[in-house]
């Protein structure tokens, strides 16, 4: 079979396939025989319909169309095998089907053209002399103290206060009512009873906590506050509102002692000393992990920057679908109504928003895989098996696709080995954490965009 290849943009190739005359004749005969067996014509038994009557009943054009569909399917498969081509996704017919019907004659050669996505050709840059800047996360002992403070707050006992005014750190129970500072009229839904106000700066509307400071139980106070411009309720966004606040109860927090009993209540450690040591180790490892991730990310992005590759649309669409699937599962775990978010109208926009991150993710994955291939980096089956065993010991009660799990673990470990190999050859400059934050990643931007709809769903539940 004669096949002419043409390289096309976006990792596509075009194929011009000439079907031999003998094939067009034999396929025509076979299709007609099959039709004769399957078509019911009154007065004739199945398979006994005379050829001429069959053609008259079905029409020459319909028979030709059936033959051409069979020819394209079979000959395309043969051409791909003959040329050693692995197609991604479904090939697209470039020839007009009507033109093929008009040109087709049994016993004469027929030529048709298709385009198809193929794996991209990747040209790596100078990967042995990379120079990158990454953020270093340094372990801060204060993180342990903050952890203790948070747990103490969670386990605090609330004790009624009668002899002083409210102060930061207290819990106030208040009734509130709001009216427009402009018209003096009450505002619907801006009122409530028994609202718990944790007296922490920055909570609720700006100025509310500060206004409550000093109030005592049963005291009533008016304060004028301005809602932020991005407040979900449009009728009060950026508007000044006069609040009438009635202090009903005031409570102080009594924090539990940091002793062995506390350690046993908040962890599986027996003593406070053991818990502190465990936390120190955890936060130290977390700092090391964050530094490693920053280095890996910088190396990967620099590797992609120096590489040349053209992504096929099939892979991009597949990655976009993967991103949306992950978002779907995350929103579901958050308790959001995913059917309200992932609507027929929303999905096209969500796919569009996810596309930049899909492209970036694909490039990073493919370039690292190409480097592993070029540098001869491998991962041992024994290491993969050990990792799988560790995972399965934690997921013993779940139905797992072992073949898929092995593939994912192998790819992850291969990428890990490749980046470790790359680190040894690269020049890496570490800067303090937060120094590079202005360079927001594509992934973060995509997550923020996809989460926007979820925020709207939750907006109605926001506190005043």
From Swiss-Prot:
<keyword id="KW-0132">Cell division</keyword>
<dbReference type="GO" id="GO:0043335">
    <property type="term" value="P:protein unfolding"/>
</dbReference>
<dbReference type="GO" id="GO:0044183">
    <property type="term" value="F:protein folding chaperone"/>
</dbReference>
<dbReference type="GO" id="GO:0043022">
    <property type="term" value="F:ribosome binding"/>
</dbReference>
<dbReference type="Pfam" id="PF00254">
    <property type="entry name" value="FKBP_C"/>
</dbReference>
<dbReference type="InterPro" id="IPR037041">
    <property type="entry name" value="Trigger_fac_C_sf"/>
</dbReference>
<comment type="function">
    <text>Involved in protein export. Acts as a chaperone by maintaining the newly synthesized protein in an open conformation. Functions as a peptidyl-prolyl cis-trans isomerase.</text>
</comment>
<keyword id="KW-0143">Chaperone</keyword>
<protein>
    <recommendedName>
        <fullName>Trigger factor</fullName>
        <ecNumber>5.2.1.8</ecNumber>
    </recommendedName>
</protein>
<comment type="similarity">
    <text>Belongs to the FKBP-type PPIase family. Tig subfamily.</text>
</comment>
<dbReference type="InterPro" id="IPR005215">
    <property type="entry name" value="Trig_fac"/>
</dbReference>
<dbReference type="GO" id="GO:0061077">
    <property type="term" value="P:chaperone-mediated protein folding"/>
</dbReference>
<dbReference type="InterPro" id="IPR008881">
    <property type="entry name" value="Trigger_fac_ribosome-bd_bac"/>
</dbReference>
<dbReference type="InterPro" id="IPR036611">
    <property type="entry name" value="Trigger_fac_ribosome-bd_sf"/>
</dbReference>
<dbReference type="InterPro" id="IPR046357">
    <property type="entry name" value="PPIase_dom_sf"/>
</dbReference>
<dbReference type="Pfam" id="PF05698">
    <property type="entry name" value="Trigger_C"/>
</dbReference>
<dbReference type="InterPro" id="IPR001179">
    <property type="entry name" value="PPIase_FKBP_dom"/>
</dbReference>
<keyword id="KW-0131">Cell cycle</keyword>
<keyword id="KW-0963">Cytoplasm</keyword>
<dbReference type="InterPro" id="IPR008880">
    <property type="entry name" value="Trigger_fac_C"/>
</dbReference>
<dbReference type="GO" id="GO:0051083">
    <property type="term" value="P:'de novo' cotranslational protein folding"/>
</dbReference>
<keyword id="KW-0413">Isomerase</keyword>
<feature type="domain" description="PPIase FKBP-type">
    <location>
        <begin position="169"/>
        <end position="256"/>
    </location>
</feature>
<dbReference type="GO" id="GO:0003755">
    <property type="term" value="F:peptidyl-prolyl cis-trans isomerase activity"/>
</dbReference>
<dbReference type="Pfam" id="PF05697">
    <property type="entry name" value="Trigger_N"/>
</dbReference>
<keyword id="KW-0697">Rotamase</keyword>
<dbReference type="GO" id="GO:0015031">
    <property type="term" value="P:protein transport"/>
</dbReference>
<dbReference type="GO" id="GO:0051301">
    <property type="term" value="P:cell division"/>
</dbReference>
<dbReference type="InterPro" id="IPR027304">
    <property type="entry name" value="Trigger_fact/SurA_dom_sf"/>
</dbReference>
<dbReference type="GO" id="GO:0005737">
    <property type="term" value="C:cytoplasm"/>
</dbReference>
């Amino acid at each position: 079979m004669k096949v002419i290849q043409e390289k096309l943009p976006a990792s596509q190739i075009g194929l011009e396939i000439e079907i031999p005359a003998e094939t067009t004749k034999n396929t025509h005969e076979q299709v007609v025989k099959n039709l004769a067996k399957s078509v019911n014509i009154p007065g004739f038994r199945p398979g006994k319909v005379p050829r001429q009557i069959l053609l008259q009943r079905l029409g020459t054009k319909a028979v030709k169309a059936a033959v051409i569909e069979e020819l394209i399917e079979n000959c395309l498969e043969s051409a791909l095998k003959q040329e050693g081509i692995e197609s991604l996704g479904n090939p697209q017919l470039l020839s007009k089907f009507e033109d093929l019907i008009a040109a087709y004659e049994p016993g004469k050669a027929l030529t048709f053209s298709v385009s198809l996505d193929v794996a991209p050709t990747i040209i790596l840059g100078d990967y042995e002399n990379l120079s990158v800047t990454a953020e270093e996360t340094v372990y801060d002992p204060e993180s342990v103290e903050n952890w203790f403070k948070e747990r103490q707050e969670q386990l605090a006992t609330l004790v009624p206060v009668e002899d002083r005014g409210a102060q930061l750190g207290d819990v106030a129970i208040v009734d509130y009512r709001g009216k427009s500072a402009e018209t003096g009229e009450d505002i619907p839904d801006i009122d409530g009873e028994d609202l718990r106000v944790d007296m922490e700066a920055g909570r609720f509307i700006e100025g509310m906590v500060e206004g409550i400071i000093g109030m005592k139980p049963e005291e009533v106070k008016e304060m004028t506050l301005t809602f932020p411009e991005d407040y979900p309720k449009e009728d009060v966004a950026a508007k000044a509102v006069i609040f009438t606040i009635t202090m009903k109860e005031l409570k102080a927090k009594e924090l539990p002692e940091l002793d062995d009993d506390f350690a046993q209540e908040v962890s599986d450690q027996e003593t406070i000393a053991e818990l502190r040591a465990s936390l120190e180790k955890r936060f130290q490892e977390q700092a090391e992990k964050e530094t490693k991730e920053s280095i890996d990310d910088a190396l990967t992005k620099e590797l992609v920057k120096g590489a040349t590759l053209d992504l096929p649309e099939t892979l991009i669409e597949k990655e976009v679908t993967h991103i949306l699937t992950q978002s779907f599962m995350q929103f579901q775990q958050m308790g959001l109504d995913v059917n309200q978010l992932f609507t027929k109208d929303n999905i096209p926009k969500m796919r569009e928003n996810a596309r930049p991150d899909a492209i970036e993710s694909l490039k990073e994955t493919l370039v690292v895989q190409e480097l592993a291939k070029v540098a001869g980096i491998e991962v041992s089956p024994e290491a993969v098996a050990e990792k799988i065993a560790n995972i399965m010991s934690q997921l013993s009660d779940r139905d797992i696709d072992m073949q898929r799990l092995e593939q994912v673990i192998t790819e992850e470990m291969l990428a890990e080995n490749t980046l470790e190999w790359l680190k040894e050859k690269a020049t890496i400059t570490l800067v303090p954490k937060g120094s590079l934050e202005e360079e927001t990643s594509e992934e973060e931007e995509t997550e923020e965009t996809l989460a926007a709809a979820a925020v709207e769903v939750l907006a109605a539940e926001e506190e005043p």
